[in-house]
Structures are given as structure tokens and as C-alpha cells.
Amino acid sequence: MRKALGVFLSSMLAVSVLAGCGASTGAATSQNTEEAVEAEVQAVDANEMLSLWNENAEARQQLISYMEAITKEGGPDYIPVENRIAVFDFDGTLFCETDPNYFDYTLLVYRVLEDPEYKDQASEFEKMVANKIVDQNTNGTKYEELPVEHGQAVASAFKGMTIDEFYAYIQEFKKLPMPSYEGMTRGGGFYEPMLQVIDYLKANDFRVYVISGTDRFICRGLMLNSPLELPNYQIIGSDESVVSAKQAGEDGLNYTFEQGDDLYLGGEFIIKNLKMNKVAVINKEIGIQPVLSFGNTTGDAAMANYTIGKNPYKSLAFMLCCDDLERENGKLSKAQDMYNLCEEFNWIPVSMKNDWKTIYADGVTYIGKKAAEPAAEEAEEPAEEQVEEPAEEEEALDNAA
């Protein structure tokens, strides 16, 4: 397709030059023809790269129009390549959000309550946290302290593993089936239309970062050997400590890493990467204000507002709305809340039901929520007034945005 368009472009330019050789009007015609054909080439490329989006989707049209504007050199909205930064939430934005809970929550439950090599060693605290997650899954019980407790339990339950061992553990967990779907494993829940968006951005010289509330190393392990190809330094999440094998509890200020030493998970939870913490980590680790933001909950509101607020460049914030009940674990009340917030804060809504031709990879069939619905509904209850002054409970439970 691109080769054919290139031939077409060359032929059109040749015709315009022959028709107007030596004349200023001919030169203008040539320039106009070139611009028109270049615009057509770009439009066709967008159609190809966003083929899983319905053509009448407003979010798709806005993204394409935006890309045409910011990549036109000399245009008023042109953005230099070094400033083309896009940030994405993970759970519910790029990947199946809950089934019956977040990936990192189900990973902890498996480690503490089911893993035959660890469950007998699990601490009482880890068991308490895992059972809270199970209770939330089955009964929808709210635990406002759960996000921090979960982070602490993950850190302690995997303490002593090397980073590579942790990644390998996650690879095995990814092979387990996703309970509400046929043909999909725990690691296969990527949203295909959003993967196309990332490829489209990369093709237009964007650097893409994942800014997740999920543990940084869990995110990296989940994306390892997956359809989403990003380097680890562009995958940012909640943090836990890392130590040297020979450090023996000594403070890092007093210990020098030795050649040939190994790094291990240190067992200490540091920070949950949600809300304002997302803005802070973007500033600290990227150092450039993003021009595109993609999220799905109020946990991503700060990141969205940071992207479009006081930005010297043209910027947009997109929010996914989980309004599809036929193809995935949709939640209509949550989707409507997000539509309302998008209208209030000038974010662009993405309808999973109406904007996408498909959600998951070929061969995946949604067979029902089973135990997923109570946890998912109770885990996130965005409300308009909570964007500016989020309630403590909502901040706690909106935990993997």
C-alpha cells in the first residue's frame, strides 16, 4: 500500500511539474498537489494502523486530526520529536482491568493461598491481605487500606527473589486461564485497539510510557514476551525496594555494590503510584510534560490534567469508558461516571462498546463475569466531586489505574 502510494505521489508531482514548468502558478499547483497527496498517504496509514477502530469513532478522528497537526513541520501546532511524549495507564487502559480483580491482586492471592511452594511459608499478614482480596472478589467488601496493604504484602511475599526470578514467576502465572473468558490466559488480556494506538504513536515518533498503579516489576514481567513491546525504562509503576545479595540489611548509603553481585527484591513497599504520585513520577523519571494521556479512572485524573494543563504544545487526554457488557467485564455505572467527568474536564471519552470493532485477540470469547463483578464494581467508584478532592476511600480502592 505504501509503495503504491509512493508511486502515485511521484506521478502526481511529475504531472504537475510538466503542466506548469517555469510558471509560478505551476509551482504552487505542484506544492498543493504534494501536500494533498501527503495528507492522503497519512490518512491511509492511519486507517491501516487503526483498523480495529470504527471509522466514525470520535476519539479516533480526534487522534488522527491531532497527529496531522502536530507532525506538520512549519505548522502552528508542530511538536518537535523530543517533546512527543505519551503516557498510558495500564489496567483498564491497555489490559483487562479486573477478572475478578487486578492482575497484581490475583497474583498475590495465588502466591499466598495457592502456590504449593510458598503458601505454608506465608505470613499471617500476607494471608490476611489475600483473604481480603478474596472477600472483595466474592462479596464486594470495601477495604480502604487494601491498596497499601497489598503493596506491602507483595513486597514481603516475593522478598529474596532476584528480578529475573520474579519475572520468571510472573511468566508462569500468565499461563493460567482468565476465568471469564475462553481462549485467553492471565497474560493475554491486552486491548487490541489500544495496541494499535501505541504502534500509531511510535510510527509518528512518539515515546510511549506506561504509568501504572501496579508494581513496577509486575508490570515489566507482565509485558515481557507480550504484544506490547516497551523497554523496561518506559514502564513505571508502584515501587518496592531492591537490595544487593551481600548487603545484609546495611543502609545503601553505607554499602558499595560489588562486581558480580546480584540484585534481589528487598521486601519493603515504597509508594503506590496513583493520582498525584503519577504526576510526580512523570516529572522525576521522564522530565518532560506529556502531550498525550490515556487512562480510565479517577486514579488517572491527575495525569490527564497535568498533560493538558498549561502545556506549551497541543495536548489531549483520552479516557476509556467500560461500557461493553457483551465482550468484556463492563461496568455501566462506572462508564457513565467517566463520561460525565470527560465532559466536565475536557477529556476525550473512548467507548469500548461503540468505538472498537474488537477488544481482545482473535479466538477470545467472553463467557461471563462469574465472581468478577462485585469486586470490580466496588473497587472503583469514581464520582465527579472526587476528581478535585478525592475521598480517602475512593483513592484507596481505585488502586490499579
Q: What is each of the regions a protein language model found here?
A:
Residues M1, A27, E381-P382:
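Disordered, low-complexity tails and leader-like regions
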Residues R2-S24:
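Sec-dependent N-terminal signal peptides of Gram-positive bacterial secreted proteins and lipoproteins
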Residues K3-A4, S11, W53, S156, ...:
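A generic helix-loop boundary/linker signal
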Residues E38-D251:
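Alpha-helical substrate-recognition element adjacent to the catalytic core
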Residues L5, A19, D91, S212, ...:
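Short glycine-rich loop/turn motifs that provide flexible caps or phosphate-binding loops at active sites
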Residues L18-A36:
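Sec-dependent signal peptide cleavage junction
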Residues E35-L50, E165-Y209, G213-A401:
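C-terminal cap/substrate-recognition subdomain and adjoining C-terminal extension
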